[in-house]
Amino acid sequence: MLTKAFLSPAEIEERIAQEAASDKDRKLTPEQIEAIYSNGTNILVSASAGSGKTFVMVERILDMIGRGVGIDQLFISTFTVKAAGELKERLEKRLTKHLGQAETDEERAFLSDQIAKIGTADIGTMDAFTQKLVNQYGYLLGVSPTFRIMTDLAEQTLMKNEVYADLFNDYMQGKDAQLFQKLVRNFTGHSKTSKAFRDLVYDIYSFSQATADPEKWLCQNLLKGQIEAKPEQAKNELLDGLKDGLLADFLAFLRDHLGIAQREFAKAKYLNNVSDAIILLEGSLINDQTDMEDLLKQLLTLSGGTGLTNMTRPKDEELKAYKEAYNKTKNEFVAQLREVDTQLTVLEVLTKHNDDILPMLELLQSFVLDFSDQYLQAKIQENTFEFSDIAHFAIRILEENPEVAVSYRDRYHEVMVDEYQDNSHTQERMLELLSNGHNRFMVGDIKQSIYRFRQADPQIFNDKFQLFLENPDAGKLILLKENFRSQSEVLDATNGVFSHLMDQEIGDILYDKTHMLVAGSQKQKEPHPENETEVLIYNSDESSTSEDEEGPDQAISSGEISLVIKEIIKLHEQGVRFEDITLLAPNRNTYLDLMVSFEEHGIPLVPDEYKSSYLESLEVMIMLDTLRAINNPLNDYALVALLRSPMFNFNEDDLTRIAVQADKGQFYDKLLAAHTKSGLHPEVVMQGLEAKLTLFTETLADWRDYSKCHSIYDLIWKIYNDRFYYDYVGGLPRAEQRQANLYALALRANAYEKTGFKGLSRFIGMIDKIIASGNDLEEVTDLVPKNAVSLMTIHKSKGLEFKYVFVLQMNRKFIGHSKDGLSGKYIINREKGLGIKYLADLKDQINTNLPKLNVVLETLTFQDNRREERRASISEEMRLLYVAMTRAEKKLYLVGKGSKETLTQQYGTDVENNRLPVALRDQIATYQDWIMALDTAFMRKDLKFTVRFVEDEELTPEAIGQVEVKAAVDADDLSNNRQTEEIERALTVLESVEKLNHLYAPAIDLPSVRTPSQLKTFYEPIMDTEGVDIMDKKEGVQPLETASTFELPDFGQKTKVTGAAVGSATHELMQRLTLSDTVTLQDLTQALSRVSASDQVKARVQLEKLLGFFDTELGKLILANRDKLRREAPFAMLAEDPASKEDFVVRGIIDGYLLLEDRIVLFDYKTDHFTHPSELKTRYQGQMSLYAKALSQAYQMEKVDKYLILLGGKDLEVVEV
């Protein structure tokens, strides 16, 4: 076996010196070398943005392999499946290269072995690993290895609801029913359902599942805050803090003011109250026996109304400003005093009710524990689990079975984890159990921890960072701060912002020289003044923005969009390609507005994984309502939608004239009355409306008759043909997408009827059930332009880099500051547990005749949790801004909206430790306000960005401009036109036509669909299950008129069984076959009985071969992953003709495929006769490649394994293509 010693610290230092002395263009940094070669201890690599952490990981793995460590001796956890695939691909390429350079047979054999093992090595997500572990050792917990992962949210919700309903009824009728009703009412209020209480239970359950031991957390932490809460003690602490804090500051303020006011406002009446307040405060601060509550009430009485307000009217401008400043500060102090008074009242009430709250929450704790247990039992019974269940099973296996844990610890030379800052406590516990205590390698950057919503806890990284920093014996801390991605203008702006914003208080890390970004190469340091970071703010009147438009989900304004479009057009005119520009949005709510505006200006824009609702797309909704109206014209909503649609164009005036034809009844009856002029007001049915009604009633009647004896597929195409609807949407924005959606509707109707279900009513019922359940059908993948501006969320951009970056909606309010941010009835915290708002009945405390006097009180735990949650939320927003800013390579734009007058005068120049004060950073609600506060408090040269307000006058259509789309042929080019006589002009035209015909011959031969009729002619054979249909350019467009042929009826003749019929029957059987752990001959026979084929055809289907298929490796894989199986899946995609560069349509039906985490397994049944499998492998190579390409595009997954299942030979064969 290949073995080489690892480098010692001295050898690592020597290598660092050698690298520094080398003449390489791009040298490894000393920290990178340390990260690659250090060994023998736990290592934490804090890698700043663009510092090459993936490169370091790959090099470290290769170095270990080069020293004899097998790839199967490494545990490598990645954050996503995609990251794992990319890492495997890099390793395979590098190892293959090393294999070619190997000098000995032993080294070659070892490297070949490692390449072969990459596919099965433990490189992947923690979810994938825990599934593998539970598959192997689940029997120790009684878990069957054939378990299924429940990924469908609807399925999870259904099972949860069933368990919850039974448990809820038990508690409502149990011994603590009265207390339980009080508990439920505390969260549901006057609601007639228990949904709010159910949501609380589900939230607590979900939160507990992100901990390493859910049951332990529920028992020990859920009520920890409430148990430790001492309202009386909190009240005393609040009063004690008044003396040295608020009251002392108020006294100093009043003293300072009185000295000036007695001179400038000597006769002002309010000064007597100021003097009294000073006397009160001086006496109380000296006397330790002062009743602080009484003092507070006296001060509030003195300040009531205009008691302490300066009401004078000085003429001097300086005195006027001084007066206003005094009143403003005084009001702030009084507001704080009132807030303290309110808190004291709440604490007093909480003290009286504290003994009532805990028993109620203990009952809640019991309910959640019972729910967790019963929900798990329900999943065990169905042998289907969530990812969190599998993770906890894995932890239990390793904790309760030391021999299993030891086997893993002995196997792994090193336990590596990428994106360590986004680890959850469950994942951290798994890593601890797999490690031997000194062989962990962790890579991450706390400044990029942005996944709290997935229960990631950046404190895990932070604790390790502090531990290794303070105690090197515990582990080695390596900082990678050199950035190899961005130009100095981007790095300087990022450092300028975060060195004044981020610290341990907000951001969870002190952004000092240790963490500042440093240019990794000389080229990055070259100055480019034109690329200085710009803060672009659309100057708008804040009064025009309502509160409802503000918040984390607020829409982007048209002014911001216009501003961005103008800058992009400007960049484009300077030679910047669209594909080098990226827009980063806080969420996907802005996508549609941006797409529409960009399309209007001719700028191609590709949103990343933008998922619009297929069933809610306008063209599909209109077609569904058309089908509903055909099925039942008495459906008023569907009928009116069809009338208003572009197919018939009835306007509101038309509908009103129809509606008045009867006082009551269905709209269809009124429509018929209007058509026959037999309604209440026939005189209002004018000639134009009469023509519309005639067309509509005749068309609808024709469609209804047609639907009775034709398939839904044919009906849909008839609608497209009759009313030219397919052509109509082809002229709208996003035409290709709309037409693809309509085409897919016909395909799905056909696929639905092929399952054996017939009839328009059933199809509509199926669609309505999908809509009612909140689910959707996948939207058809659109053609994506190559040179286009990209649009994605900040979260999605993490780990990526782009030349020019626009960060949008800098004025969006943070969740913690928004109206609905933290205003719920409960907040859950990992340490303190559940904090609630308590519904207290104060009838006994207040003299009232009311039967009840309910008041909602925030418990101490709720207040504590809200403070922590708010601070944690703001810290993550700060890190999210860091991620956004560090994506740019060349230039960064920060785009927002606001009033110039307000933003430039809102903040002062106060600074603490070269940063904005903590209180101000905590109070600020948007990225934009952070930037503007920095701009006010610090010198512009320290910040390295410029702020520019853009006015409406700068955003006129003329000022914005338009992207010039160059035509392929300039029709107005008359340079070679002889222009003298008519004959010469005619010859010129003919010559031009001939040239164009020759130039575009391939495109002319390639059919282009011009009408729905022609389109249908091409699409008719789409459901052929044995192949892929391509609009072949050799076929051309068939003429509409074809010669009619009539064949004599085949009376009494014996039907000949064709191979195609047997093939179709075989495909249908495999589609109808119900899969379980094993497949028997009886299962196949039952499935065959349901096949819609003649008995002669069924007799030719070879069931023994099909049964044998499930004993093959592929058959076993399908049975083991049947929940990931897709059968008879229709597809349609656009491909480019290599000769003409024009698009043509490829479409077909895929027999089946498995959608696994790391790959797709595609398979196709073939009943063709063959003597050697290679014949069919060659024949269907192209077809399978097209299938694979379609699946790869649809699921964004590169690896597709392709198999042919050959049934036409002597024996069954499974061939990999």
Curated annotation (Swiss-Prot):
User: Cofactor(s) for this protein?
Assistant: Mg(2+)
The positions making up the signal sequence are none
Chemical reaction(s) catalysed = Couples ATP hydrolysis with the unwinding of duplex DNA by translocating in the 3'-5' direction; ATP + H2O = ADP + phosphate + H(+)
Does the record's keyword annotation contain RNA-binding? no
Query: Tell me, what is an example of a GO biological process annotation in this record?
Result: double-strand break repair via homologous recombination
Keywords, A to Z? Answer: ATP-binding, DNA damage, DNA repair, DNA-binding, Exonuclease, Helicase, Hydrolase, Isomerase, Nuclease, Nucleotide-binding
The entry lists its GO molecular-function terms as:
3'-5' DNA helicase activity; 3'-5' exonuclease activity; ATP binding; ATP hydrolysis activity; double-stranded DNA binding
Which HAMAP family does this entry report, sorted A to Z?
Answer: AddA (MF_01451)
Return the EC number: 3.1.-.-, 5.6.2.4
Residue sites binding ATP per the record: 47-54
This chain's protein is named: ATP-dependent helicase/nuclease subunit A
- Say what the protein does: The heterodimer acts as both an ATP-dependent DNA helicase and an ATP-dependent, dual-direction single-stranded exonuclease. Recognizes the chi site generating a DNA molecule suitable for the initiation of homologous recombination. The AddA nuclease domain is required for chi fragment generation; this subunit has the helicase and 3' -> 5' nuclease activities.
Q: Which domain of life is it from?
A: Bacteria
Checking Pfam families in the record gives: PDDEXK_1 (PF12705), UvrD-helicase (PF00580), UvrD_C (PF13361)
**Entry GO terms, CC:** cytosol; DNA helicase complex
UvrD-like helicase ATP-binding domain span:
26-487
Give the protein family: Belongs to the helicase family. AddA subfamily.
- What organism does the UniProt record list as the source? Streptococcus thermophilus (strain CNRZ 1066)
Subunit structure as annotated in this protein's UniProt entry: Heterodimer of AddA and AddB/RexB.
Q: Where is the UvrD-like helicase C-terminal domain?
A: 515-799
